Amino acid sequence: YIAGRSDLIDLAGERLTCPGEGREVGPTLGINRELLQGLFFAPSVVASSLKTAILTSKVLEHLGYQVEPRYDEVRADIVQNIIFNNKEDLIKYCQGIQMASPIDSNAIPVPWDMPGYTDQVIMAAGCFTQGSSIELSCDGPLRSPYIAYQQGGLTYSYGKLGIMKAVTELMKGKNEL
């Protein structure tokens, strides 16, 4: 339900359905529940994604990797860039994200020739909804400086688990683990 002044209720109806039609006709086609669930959960999911990005930045910077933005910088979105400077670390990190995923955790992402890219790309995203990078995903082109673009984390607990597994895979064979 939406409650408040009638002019604000009308504006909300216009925003949630169809401009000019408002609450009376809007093209919801039986998806009101899903639309409202999205509005309800969005603040929590975005907060979890931001916390996951900040934690990623802090942990990877502590391990000696360059990150953008840094954990203590102002953020404009939920994407965390991790600069690995070598393809092996980029691949291992993305594979670790996939291993911690709720869907297809047994899949092993490998670099491939993706249409539209001049370099091979590795993509990790074991998501409930295909293509939903907000759940937790990590990808990057295999070219210098080998940047991983990580985003998402439906819950902060899941985001932390993903980072822990990715760092574990990243550090295999290195003395710092």
PLM segments and residue spans:
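Conserved C-terminal alpha-helix-loop-beta "cap" of PLP-dependent enzymes
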Residues: P69-R70, A76-E176
